[in-house]
Amino acid sequence: MLLKSYVFFLLSLLIVGLFTSRDADAQYEDLVTGYLRKGGVSGVSDFEPIEVFGEDYDSDEADEDGKG
C-alpha cells in the first residue's frame, strides 16, 4: 500500500510538472513591460489625495520615543 501511495505521488508530481510552464517568469516580465509601456492604469494622473482628519504629521519631528 505504501508503494502505491509513493508511485501515485511521483506520477502526480510528473503530471503537475508537465502542465507547469518553466518560463513563467519570462511571461510575467513580458506582461509587466507591456503594462509599463502602456503607462499603467488609466486615471492615475487624475489622482487627488483624500482628506485626513486629525493631527498634522511632521516627518521632521521625532516620534514619542525620541527616535527620528
From Swiss-Prot:
Q: Which UniProt keywords apply?
A: Cleavage on pair of basic residues, Secreted, Signal
| Record's keyword annotation contains Metal-binding | no
Q: Pro-segment residues?
A: 27-38
The record's GO CC annotations read: extracellular region
Q: Which domain of life is it from?
A: Eukaryota
Q: Is Nucleotide-binding a UniProt keyword of this protein?
A: no
Q: What is its main location?
A: secreted
Tissue-level expression:
Expressed in salivary glands.
Entry coiled-coil feature ranges = none
* Disulfide feature: none
Signal peptide span per the entry? 1-26
Q: Where in the cell is it found?
A: Secreted
Which function does this protein serve? Horsefly salivary gland immunosuppressant protein that likely inhibits the host inflammatory response by regulation of anti- and pro-inflammatory cytokines. When tested on mouse splenocytes in the presence of LPS, it increases the secretion of the proinflammatory cytokine interleukin-10 (IL10) and decreases the secretion of the proinflammatory cytokine interferon-gamma (IFNG) in a dose-dependent manner.
Q: What is this protein called?
A: Tabimmunregulin 1
Say which species the protein is native to: Tabanus yao
